[in-house]
Amino acid sequence: MSRYHTFTAADAVEYARQFGQIADPLALVTADEIGDGNLNLVFKIRDAAGMSRVIVKQALPYVRCVGESWPLTLDRARIEAETLLTHGQFCPQHTVNVLHHDAELAVMVQEDLSDHEIWRSELVKGKYYPQAAGQLAEYLAQTLFHTSDFYQSAQAKKAAVSRYTNPELCQITEDLFFTDPYIDHERNNFDPALLPEVLALRQDDALKLAVASLKHRFLSKAEALLHGDIHSGSIFVADGRLKAIDAEFGFYGPIGFDVGTALGNLLLNYCGLPGLAGPRDAAAGREQRLKDIHILWETFSHRFLALCEEKTQDSTLATAGYARLFLQQVWQDAVGYCGSELIRRTIGLAHVADLDSIADDEMRRACQRHALSLGRTLILAASRIDSIDDLIARIRQNG
């Protein structure tokens, strides 16, 4: 008989006392359920003084925003914990610290990050963290290189691909990124004023052909252990610090997907800034986002290449020039997946505050149309955008 049961606040406190690695566990007395996502319960465990000391996260057996009509495997909690532990092995400074996890209860205890802020919220408020893009690039380079064929033995990699097979969560990504936005589906969510743009996307055969190629690569390219959902809402930042959280979508997939999703979320903020700030602040913020995406790719690519030169285990993959050739394909994948993120976050199920929090209706629609137009451009032109400078030029041309 399964030990699984949905935690109450009292259950979360007791669990944190046992597994929170707190010197004075009985000091933990209350729990606040703070989960704002679709898949989990998240409790902040506080002491008598009201200070948050540790986080308890439990997977629910269904999609929270839909209900029990959309069931989900609880094994995703194991995959999330093990993904974070693996990523933490290679990049501890930028991965949330997992203190304990229990696969049967689908629960994880992790460090409290109350001294950090969610990066998306800070971007929407116009607060700039100049080191964040480079730190995210370091996280991506370290975690993706060390779980790839460049570093892992073929036997270890194949075993890991099996261990991290995550079909139900991948199905969500496959549907929300590559299928739903291009068909009439009940999960789609968009302003009726955008219907002409939505219909144009559905009828764009060249776009749908390019999206089919992106989906096929997502389905078939087990290049590294991805975070799988690395957007600005799954990243905590503080001055000089950054940590990735929420890795339940982890699986072995195309490296460009994680990189492209990260780039796409910076560009969602770029598209939303005219509606989030006055003209001068919006213009300055947009230049910051372009600087961020430049730093993100340049730092990631240089770091990944350096790791390949230093640590590649396979003698064939160590052939001079191969890592750079491989990285060029990662880049083109990333540009395409970046475009997919722009489109699906605008008209699909899961939106972002960078666009949806814009108060003025007409300005919000203009920013959403920009995101759709830019997303389409990037998907269609990915194979012809050869460098980060080319990408930035395309972004400027698009508005």
UniProtKB/Swiss-Prot annotation:
> What SUPFAM superfamilies does the annotation carry?
Protein kinase-like (PK-like)
Question: Which residues hold ATP?
Answer: 40, 57, 111-113, 246-248
Q: Which molecular-function annotations from GO does this UniProt entry contain?
A: ATP binding; S-methyl-5-thioribose kinase activity
Q: Name one GO biological process term.
A: L-methionine salvage from methylthioadenosine
Which top-level group of life is the source organism from? Bacteria
Pathway recorded for this protein: Amino-acid biosynthesis; L-methionine biosynthesis via salvage pathway; S-methyl-5-thio-alpha-D-ribose 1-phosphate from S-methyl-5'-thioadenosine (hydrolase route): step 2/2
InterPro entries from the UniProt entry: Aminoglycoside_PTrfase, Kinase-like_dom_sf, Methylthioribose_kinase
Question: Mind listing the UniProt keywords for this protein, alphabetically?
Answer: Amino-acid biosynthesis, ATP-binding, Kinase, Methionine biosynthesis, Nucleotide-binding, Transferase
The residues that the entry says bind substrate are 229, 344
What EC number(s) are associated with this protein in UniProt?
2.7.1.100
Q: Identify the Gene3D superfamilies for this entry.
A: 3.90.1200.10, Phosphorylase Kinase, domain 1
How it assembles, according to the record, is:
Homodimer.
**Function comment:** Catalyzes the phosphorylation of methylthioribose into methylthioribose-1-phosphate.
Which family is this protein grouped under?
Belongs to the methylthioribose kinase family.
NCBIfam families associated with the record:
MTRK
Listed name of the protein: Methylthioribose kinase
Lineage summary: Bacteria, Pseudomonadati, Pseudomonadota, Gammaproteobacteria, Enterobacterales
